[in-house]
From Swiss-Prot:
InterPro entries: ATPase_NBD, N-acetyl-D-glucosamine_kinase, ROK, ROK_cs. The gene is nagK. One of its GO terms (biological process) is peptidoglycan turnover. Catalyzes the phosphorylation of N-acetyl-D-glucosamine (GlcNAc) derived from cell-wall degradation, yielding GlcNAc-6-P. This is N-acetyl-D-glucosamine kinase. It comes from Pasteurella multocida (strain Pm70). GO terms for molecular function: ATP binding; N-acetylglucosamine kinase activity; zinc ion binding. Zn(2+) binds at H157, C178, C180, C185. ATP binds at residues 4-11, 133-140. CDD domains: ASKHA_NBD_ROK_NAGK (cd24057). It catalyses: N-acetyl-D-glucosamine + ATP = N-acetyl-D-glucosamine 6-phosphate + ADP + H(+). Belongs to the ROK (NagC/XylR) family. NagK subfamily. It holds the Pfam family ROK.
Amino acid sequence: MRYGFDIGGTKIELAVFNDQLEKQYSERVETPKESYEEWLNTIVRLVHKADEMFQCQGTVGLGIPGFVNPATGIAEIVNIRAADHKPIIQDLETRLGREVRAENDANCFALSEAWDEENAQYPSVLGLILGTGFGGGLIFNGKVHSGQTGMAGEVGHTQLNYHALRLLGGDNAPIYDCGCGNRACLDTYLSGRGFEMLYRDMQGEALSAQAIIQRFYAGDQSAVKFVELFIELCAISIGNLITVLDPHVIVLGGGLSNFDYLYEALPKALPARLLRSANVPLIKKAKYGDSGGVRGAAALFLSK
């Protein structure tokens, strides 16, 4: 069996999958926030419970809101204080007596989609999350590309370029501070939160993303104008990723991925932002939704 964990700041979810990545069982518990020992023991208890339930010793994959440096084994998980700057892989392997693998949760999302039967034909899959933040993961031949420090795919912490700033008003463009310490990171613009902040600052009215989209479909001209601008901003930013990575398919997840107009408008806007010889990759909506993280974590032990 394949055990996949989604490690969040408020909850830890375990899901058990068979070798075909079909879910057999799942359980959620609260995330211990202060005690590292309690955090480790929570995961260990869930693993042992699954072992007993399925009469096997399953593989253990973790999806975390951060990364583990491959060189040092130290986790960087700033919103889970109990496990931040701790050797989580080594300590879990010692307690469980088996190999443990961990990846950023956006990488796990992308890996889950890459292992879908419809996407398995593609050698490269770029997963992008337009949710609370903007993140991504790159999959080559069914494997996560993590980079030398585990930080590959942190597309949300690249910054707006010249064309994006001009689109947003040049010297008058809204510039947002990012939690990483930089300014004008894509995380603060292409996320659901960024969508709302941009509308507020450019249209002078604070609305939820859902309300903005409802106005767009109702034909409200301020919403229509804003959405077209946002699509162009996505085309500039995602176009840069396509130029560098040249993926076969892009899968979108997160709350804004439910905005169906994206799949109509973005492919039309992208060619103007790419080299003439480039192909616009297939852009599609994620299939697994909230289950993508645990499913991708379980897939960390699969290979083509």
